[in-house]
Amino acid sequence: MKSIFITGIAGMLGSNLAYLLKDSYHISGVDLNKVQIGGVDSHLFSAFDLEKIRELFLQHKVDVLIHCAALVNVDECEEKPDYAQKVNYELTKNLAELCRELKVKMIFISTDAVFDGNKEGLYKETDIPGPISVYASTKLQAEQYVQQFSENIVVRTNIYGFNYREKNSFGEWIISSLNNNDNLSMFYDIYFSPILVNELASILSMCIDRNLCGLYHICSTGSISKYEIAIAIMEEFKLSGAIFQASMEDHEFRAPRTKNMGLSNEKISKELGIHISTPLEGVKEFKRLYDRRYHEQLKKG
């Protein structure tokens, strides 16, 4: 059984990975927030403590690191560029060097925001990035460093799903808001390729088992606007309330936003020989998970 170590194990991606993969691998990880999932060895300290990370790598005989920890608040990155550089680039660089030293494969979770959004259609791995925010720039720098080592994987993605912590994810926020009869304004002019975190976990498991390496876009098949996916969630969950169209052009942000974050998953789909859900198929599975009380099982660990 392979041993996998997860940074940011209490976050939405990290906790779902731990919960979903714990029966197939030995799972350990680190976070500043507490996480209790049966069969998972989680440790409460900063991923910046490389000596402790080294000790845990050796203790758990780690084969693969999935590096989820990051500063993902785009506006906070813009306000604190030095801190964003430290968390998103320097930490990743240090972990990549440790992985190289200890012969651990690294899977780096990156973002769809590395492109400038000016392309019509979906971005492929061969398209040239053009980050327009501090967040995107720091993640791209980290990507480039990690890719120096041929055994590693860089994953560009955009996820939604259920959160382990008492903090609503994007999808949960839509459900909660509509349940409270709140009116929502969603952007009709921002497009992305969101993938359900459960499906991403399954695909990452395939990547590990087949020892893939390189850069991959792991995302939904096709793209959708923020407004369209909110409407889809409302209809699938049979919620009342109102969702209004809004334009990114009418809002001021601290950090610039990318209008088109749509990614093509053709490369990973062909290499693994799989179909990845469209955004609307993903929403249907999101509802099925809700009906099966997956969110409650996840929180119980």
Predicted regions span which residues?
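N-terminal Rossmann NAD(P)H-binding glycine-rich loop of SDR-like oxidoreductase domains
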Residues: 2-24
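Amphipathic terminal alpha-helices
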Residues: 279-301
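Substrate-binding strand-loop-helix patch
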Residues: 164-165, 190-198, 218-236, 285
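Catalytic helix-loop patch of NAD(P)-dependent Rossmann-fold dehydrogenases
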Residues: 86, 90-94, 114-155, 159-162
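NAD(P)H-binding glycine-rich loop region in Rossmannoid oxidoreductase-like domains
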Residues: 45-87
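Mid/C-terminal beta-alpha module of Rossmann-like enzyme folds, strongest
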Residues: 203, 210-253, 259, 294-300
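NAD(P)-cofactor binding segment of oxidoreductase domains
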Residues: 79-107
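NAD(P)-dependent short-chain dehydrogenase/reductase
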Residues: 144-192, 198-199, 205
